[in-house]
C-alpha cells in the first residue's frame, strides 16, 4: 500500500470537510429574510404549530422544531422548556440552525398591572430580568447582564425590535374582540403567586406582566443580532390564586398570544 498516497488522500479529505463545514457555517450566519420564528413552551406554542401547513418536524439536542407555512409565510417554531436556561437553549439552537430574520416569543404571563385581566394580550415593548443582580443586606440590587467575552454590558431591558413592534401594534388593531396592551414584561425563574412581590415589580420596574422565559430569549437574540419581541396573554394576577387561574386560562390565553404573533408576522412579511 502506498502510505504517502493514503496520507495525502486523508489530508485532502479533511481539508475538503473543513471547507464544507466553514461554508455551511457561513451560510447559517446569514439570516433568511423570509423565515420567521416563534418560540414558546410546548403547551403554549401548540396553537401556532397546529396552523402550520406542510409541517416538517426535527429534533436537535432534545428541542423540537417544526417548519412549515401559514398563508404562504415561512415559519419555524421552537418548543422551549420552562425557565430561562431552557429558553436560552432553544433560542440558541434555533438561531444557529435555522437563521430566522426575526423571533417572536409567544405564550402566557401573570399580570403585574392589576388593570390587566385574563385573556388580555401584552406586547412587550421591552423585556428584562427581575431576579438578576446582587443580594445585599438591603435586598436585591438589580443590574444588567454582561457579555464577559467582549466586556459589553447589556441594556437593563432588551427593547423589542422596532419593525416587530410596529408590526405588532398594527396587527393588534385587527383584534377587535381582544384587549391588547403594551409595556415592560419581566422574567424570572419562579412562578409568581405573591401580591406583595407583584406590587414590588410594578412599583420598582413599572412592569405590566411577569413570566419565566422572555428576557432569556431576547438576550440570546441580542447576541446574535436578530430582532425579537415577546407577546404574552394573561392567565392570572400573580397572586394566591395564580396556579388555579393559570390552569383555567392557559389554553385560550395561548391562542390569543399565538393569534397576535401570526398576525404580526403577516404584517412584517408585507415589507419583505
Regions found by a protein language model. Give the residues of each.
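Bacterial N-terminal signal peptides
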Residues: 10-21
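N-terminal targeting signals for Sec/Tat export/insertion, comprising classic cleavable signal peptides
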Residues: 35-63
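Glycine-rich phosphate- or other oxyanion-binding loops that anchor nucleotides, phosphorylated ligands
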Residues: 31-35, 59-272
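N-terminal secretory signal peptides that target proteins for export/translocation
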Residues: 1-6
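Boundary at the C-terminal end of the N-terminal hydrophobic targeting segment
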Residues: 26-29
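General helical structural elements
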Residues: 8-11, 236
Amino acid at each position: 500500500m502506498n502510505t504517502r498516497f493514503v496520507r495525502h488522500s486523508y489530508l485532502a479529505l479533511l481539508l475538503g470537510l473543513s471547507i464544507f463545514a466553514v461554508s455551511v457555517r457561513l451560510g447559517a450566519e446569514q439570516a433568511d429574510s423570509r423565515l420567521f420564528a416563534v418560540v414558546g413552551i410546548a403547551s403554549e406554542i401548540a396553537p401556532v404549530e397546529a396552523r402550520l401547513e406542510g409541517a416538517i418536524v426535527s429534533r436537535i439536542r432534545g428541542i423540537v422544531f417544526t417548519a412549515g407555512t401559514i398563508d404562504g409565510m415561512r415559519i419555524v417554531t421552537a418548543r422551549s422548556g420552562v425557565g430561562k436556561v431552557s429558553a436560552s437553549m432553544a433560542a440558541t439552537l434555533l438561531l444557529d440552525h435555522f437563521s430566522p430574520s426575526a423571533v417572536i416569543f409567544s405564550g402566557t404571563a401573570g399580570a403585574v398591572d392589576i388593570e390587566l385581566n385574563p385573556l388580555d394580550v401584552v406586547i412587550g415593548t421591552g423585556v428584562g430580568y427581575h431576579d438578576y443582580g446582587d443580594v445585599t443586606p438591603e435586598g436585591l440590587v438589580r443590574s444588567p447582564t454582561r457579555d464577559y467575552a467582549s466586556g459589553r454590558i447589556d441594556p437593563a431591558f432588551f427593547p423589542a425590535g422596532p419593525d416587530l413592534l410596529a408590526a405588532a401594534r398594527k396587527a393588534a388593531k385587527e383584534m377587535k374582540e381582544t384587549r391588547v396592551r403594551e409595556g415592560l414584561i419581566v422574567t424570572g425563574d419562579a412562578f409568581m403567586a405573591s401580591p406583595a412581590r407583584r406590587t414590588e415589580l410594578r412599583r420598582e420596574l413599572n412592569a405590566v406582566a411577569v413570566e419565566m422565559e422572555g428576557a432569556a430569549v431576547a438576550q440570546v437574540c441580542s447576541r446574535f443580532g436578530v430582532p425579537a419581541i415577546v407577546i404574552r396573554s394573561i392567565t392570572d394576577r400573580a397572586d394566591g390564586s395564580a396556579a388555579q387561574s393559570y390552569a383555567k386560562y392557559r389554553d385560550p390565553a395561548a391562542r390569543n398570544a399565538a393569534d397576535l404573533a401570526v398576525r404580526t408576522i403577516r404584517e412584517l412579511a408585507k415589507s419583505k
